[in-house]
């Protein structure tokens, strides 16, 4: 059984899901497994710092949560990327006895001369021998808070989406795609009362096109192109109650959705 398990793990690490899918449609997965057993993983979170937006991150002392008895200094790297997926700069932080720390990413980005929207990733550098020996990884898909004074004083929070990128000696995107077009219907009905902004991050290592189809009324279509590691958004104001279908080669093109109301906003996954 151990040999079979090791063989399956080798396949998952070294053979792209799209090739396995040709053999059997059941053999698909959403993210890759890092080749380096000491790698750490993060989501690629949308960073909003333009037009009075601010982004906050609830940073947890993950090594301390794994081993609460031992006092461990949690060394963290926050990587900032532009909207095309280019690495701009890295911010390092050490958590001592804190369990949680709220980071103001707009302030941090300003110190790094970053003024434009993009994405960010959070890597906990502490290597856990117990985790790596069992084939597990430290991953951060924690909570991100967004705030805009034009939409009221309250932050809107949303959790991470995917194991998007890994880091050890280098950064590696973990998203997978398919030879076949995938149809994903957003699990939400869009109301004509509100405006919406949908954000997608391309976690794969190839350019991707996502086509939006309005399933209600006119069947209108709109396509966006996203570079590897990049992020794109789409503003949507429906004329009536609407459902959106997404067509792409990504195994799951799940967006982060902002709903803009009069004096407030909400943020959630689609």
What residues fall within each predicted segment?
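Gly/Pro-rich, tryptophan- and cysteine-flecked surface segments typical
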Residues: 1-270
């Amino acid at each position: 059984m151990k040999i079979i398990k090791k063989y399956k793990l080798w396949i998952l690490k070294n053979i792209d899901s799209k090739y396995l899918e040709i053999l059997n449609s059941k053999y698909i997965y959403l993210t890759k497994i890092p080749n380096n057993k000491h790698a750490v993983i993060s989501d690629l979170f949308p960073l909003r710092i333009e037009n009075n937006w601010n982004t906050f991150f609830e940073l947890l002392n993950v090594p301390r949560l794994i081993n609460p008895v031992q006092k461990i200094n949690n060394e963290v790297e926050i990587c900032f990327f532009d909207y095309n997926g280019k690495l701009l700069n890295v911010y390092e932080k050490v958590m001592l006895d804190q369990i949680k720390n709220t980071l103001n990413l707009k302030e941090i980005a300003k110190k790094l001369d970053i003024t434009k929207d993009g994405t960010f990733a959070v890597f906990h550098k502490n290597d856990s021998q117990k985790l790596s020996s069992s084939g597990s990884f430290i991953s951060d898909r924690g909570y991100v808070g967004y705030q805009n004074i034009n939409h009221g004083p309250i932050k809107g929070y949303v959790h991470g989406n995917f194991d998007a990128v890994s880091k050890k000696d280098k950064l590696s995107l973990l998203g997978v795609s398919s030879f076949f077009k995938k149809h994903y219907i957003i699990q939400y009905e869009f109301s004509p009362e509100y405006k919406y902004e949908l954000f997608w991050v391309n976690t794969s290592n190839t350019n991707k096109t996502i086509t939006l189809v309005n399933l209600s009324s006119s069947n209108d279509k709109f396509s966006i192109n996203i570079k590897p590691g990049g992020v794109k958004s789409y503003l949507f104001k429906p004329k009536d109650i609407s459902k959106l279908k997404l067509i792409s080669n990504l195994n799951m093109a799940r967006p982060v959705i902002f709903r803009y109301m009069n004096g407030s906003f909400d943020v959630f996954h689609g």
